[in-house]
């Protein structure tokens, strides 16, 4: 980039830069700094350049992995969707129109927002997001047999797509292909507003965990338009990543460094076992302890611990506030958390927050 003489401080990073400059990875090597001086004395001019490098640090980012635009059956063009996401406080979205690939070159430049290319592979027998790639497969999306479906998934996986199985237990749009024969990375266990089918999907996923499968879960709003029941980032994927770059976000999502909330809320739970948190596999030993910090609880919120032996209530919040506790990790397996909340008087409580597990071997 370049700028006029009135600017004496600039910054460049992988995801952002001073206006007039382009974001760019700070690759190792020799970089050139060009300085213009309008008037130079015969003795020359002394120039002092200060360089400050800020290393990456992991932090939380909020986003939505499942959105639609006018390119399929959504109601907003992509630029409106992107602005809508930023207005909701989101740091990233994935664009997943039905069987419609999208090019990064078409993405609007919205400060503070990372847009991830993807598509929702849509078939009468199941839906699946292919994320992080513009062209996951060649030819038509459609398949007529299980074998053709397997080939489509294998091709997308080989090309680098991150694959999620969407709303697997929905009555009208469930997933009816054989998962054992498909390559995939994640399962979308929370799709749109919390409802019985999502609770069933979370339970189904937990049975996988209890059977020893280290399966990462995700969530997505399946956003098409704002209605009484549907909102962008309802639910929200909260991701612990090194930066908001597409690469860092997708690596963290694939690894399970995430939890899900009903909206871009302040509700937050940190769960650490020494240096390990969600999605990490840690060696178990006697005396291992987990540290839990919950923030922005509402009165009557219930924190539940789920492990290979079942579920137990850790805390019933008597009022708004935060809560901290230390827990013993009793044996190998996994631990994860859920926070249940009663959103309306007279209705049953439902999950307001769900985490991925920490695993122990």
Q: Which sequence ranges carry the predicted segments?
A:
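A metal-dependent hydrolase metal-coordination microenvironment
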Residues: 55-182, 188-205, 211, 220-227, ...
